Amino acid sequence: MKDSYISIVIAYLMVTFILVSSMPIEGEKGELGPHRLPCPPEYANYCFNGKCVHFVAQDEPGKPCYSCICDKFYIGKRCGTLDLTNPDF
């Protein structure tokens, strides 16, 4: 039972990663959308292998929420991990 639970969690994480990594960052007019903004210049190197995005809707008072949209084959909070499980690798 534990193995099937782990398999389900891994499958869920892989699907989530695929969905997030395939999301376009910029819209047709070069806008990130109403809840996403480009990160300020001081965060230009925040993501190791991806693009930094400021998620305004998730900000806490005095604590902005920055996240990364990872390049292909990279995962992790700051896109610092090479995804060797990707079948296209």
UniProtKB/Swiss-Prot annotation:
GO terms for cellular component: extracellular region. Residues 43-80 form the EGF-like domain. Expressed by the venom gland. PROSITE patterns: EGF_1 (PS00022). It is found in: Secreted. GO terms for molecular function: toxin activity. The keyword Disulfide bond applies. Its main location: secreted. Disulfide bonds join C39-C52, C47-C68, C70-C79. Keywords: Disulfide bond, EGF-like domain, Neurotoxin, Secreted, Signal, Toxin. Residues 1-30 form the signal peptide. Belongs to the EGF domain peptide family. Ant peptide with probable defensive activity which acts as a potent agonist of the mammalian epidermal growth factor receptor (EGFR). Mimics, both structurally and functionally, vertebrate epidermal growth factor (EGF) peptide hormones. In vivo, intraplantar injection in mice causes long-lasting (several days) hypersensitivity of the injected paw to both mechanical and thermal stimuli. Its long-lasting effect is unusual for venom toxins whose effects are usually immediate. This is OMEGA-ectatommitoxin(02)-Rm1b. It comes from Rhytidoponera metallica.
